C-alpha cells in the first residue's frame, strides 16, 4: 500500500511524537495515525499519496474530519520525494473537491513546528488552533 512508505517517513522524520498506526478496517473513516506528546496530547493524521490532481477520500474519511475538525491533520505526498504537505483536517471537503491547496506546512521541519508548537515563549501556530 502506498501509504506504508509515507508512514515510514513519518516515523523517521517526527520521532518526538509517539505514533500508533490505526487499523482502518476496524472503524471506517478513522485516520491512519494517532499521535501523542505529553505537552500537546492526542491528534490524528490521515496519510494520502497523491497520484492525480485531486486527493481521494472516502465518504467516511470526509465525515470523520468534518465531525472532528480540531487536532486532525492530513499528510499528503506525491511521488516526488520532497513533496510532503500538511493540511488541516477541517479542509477535507475542499481537498476532496478541488485538490491540493495552500498547505499549512510543506517540509518535515514545518510539519514538526505545526504539530508541536514551541512550548516556551511562542504562541501556538495558527494551524494547530
Model-predicted segments: where are they?
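Conserved catalytic cores of phosphodiester-cleaving nucleases, focusing on short active-site segments
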Residues: 33-35, 41-51
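Short strand-connecting beta-turns/loops that link adjacent beta-strands
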Residues: 38-40, 79-80
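Acidic-basic catalytic patches of nuclease active cores, encompassing PD-(D/E)XK
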Residues: 1-24, 38
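Arg/Gly-rich low-complexity intrinsically disordered repeat tracts
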Residues: 117-129
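Beta-rich catalytic cores
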Residues: 29
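Mg2+/Mn2+-dependent nuclease catalytic core
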Residues: 50-68
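Charged phosphate-binding loop/patch that engages nucleotide di/tri-phosphates or the phosphate backbone
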Residues: 97-120
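Nucleic-acid nuclease catalytic cores
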Residues: 66-91
